[in-house]
A protein has these predicted regions:
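ATP-dependent carboxylate-amine ligase catalytic core
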Residues: 14-105, 117-125, 129-131
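Short, surface-exposed amphipathic charged segments that create phosphate/polyanion-binding patches used
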Residues: 148-164
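Histidine-centered active-site loop/cap adjacent to the catalytic His
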Residues: 164-171
Length: 172
């Protein structure tokens, strides 16, 4: 995922397109998790975005339960992107699938880099189940790009596509 974010960011930078990335993990500061044109968000805008995300989490906690650290961070990132008027962002998902906090972002296109037996307690315990879950990462009828996939234990590669409504998939 990180390599795809870096590659797309480099292409956007070369084209002169202002954009944000949400790389992970951070090495020194949470601010590294939201970068605009390759630079971490400044401390004050980041702190303001976190404060707004915490306020929003408090407002809905009674209905949906407490937010996780990742959900609050994603909320802060999306708020920062809104405040900075970012129209192009490369958002790296967490665990992937419909339960991932980044799924709230309507990015218009999704990239599934690979499907493996990870986050099984949330995504399923088979490659097929995980592929279907990760396939819902994107918006229906929006483009979905995917890296080279190989059949594992007889599961067809096309199981990574969420539904017949997916507009197209680029096979690498």
């Amino acid at each position: 995922k990180g390599s795809v974010v870096a590659l797309v960011s480099a292409a956007l930078r070369a084209a002169g397109i202002r954009h944000a990335t949400t790389p992970k993990p951070h090495l020194v500061s949470y601010r590294e998790r939201v970068q605009i044109d390759g630079q971490p968000l400044a401390p004050l805008p980041f702190a303001q975005a976190v404060a707004r995300a915490l306020d929003a989490a408090d407002q809905i906690e009674e209905r949906v339960g407490p937010a996780t650290e990742f959900e609050i961070l994603v909320g802060a990132i999306f708020e920062a992107l809104r405040q900075e008027k970012i129209t192009t962002a490369i958002v790296e998902v967490g665990l992937g699938g419909r339960l991932d906090a980044t799924h709230a972002w309507d990015g218009g296109v999704a990239v599934v880099t690979n499907v493996g037996l990870d986050h099984q307690q949330y995504l399923g315990d088979t490659i097929e189940a995980i592929a279907k879950e990760k396939g819902v990462t994107h918006i229906t009828n929006a483009p979905m790009l995917r890296g080279r996939m190989v059949s594992v234990k007889g599961v067809p590669v096309d199981k990574v596509e969420a539904s017949p409504e997916a507009a197209w998939a680029l096979r690498g």
